[in-house]
Amino acid sequence: MSATLPRHVAIIMDGNGRWATNRGWARLVGHRKGAERVREIVRAAPDLGIRWLTLYAFSTENWKRSTEEVLGLMAIFARYIEREADRLAKAGVRMRFIGDRSRLDPKLQRMMAGIEARTAGLDRLNLTVAINYGGRDEIVRAVRKIAEAAAQGI
């Protein structure tokens, strides 16, 4: 009997730092290892029939971590985009980001916008990365937008 795989898979990227700490390594080593696994998953997903992949990569709560860890995570995101952009585009992967970009480094924001534009018409795999994202934060931002629109009579 063959297994039916879902067309949309969501992964909460949690535990990489703890995994590394439990092995006596720096937390960022775990985050780098997690990014390597993501690369493998993104490559395999389309061949498995998965069309949508959502990665919850950095929540609004992650800002509470040490400055070193936050900066390290942002560097890993930037390096991933930089190293994988060509391969993703050639493989037909559309990459999008959700979450509040306003706190992110402007250079990272430009990189994100660039890869989104470059891969916009592709559809072999729809890769969505949630960065600076939180369900509660998303609701608050949506309500604020609605309130602003109502105040303007829209």
Model-derived features with residue positions:
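Flexible, compositionally biased loop and terminal segments
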Residues: 1-154
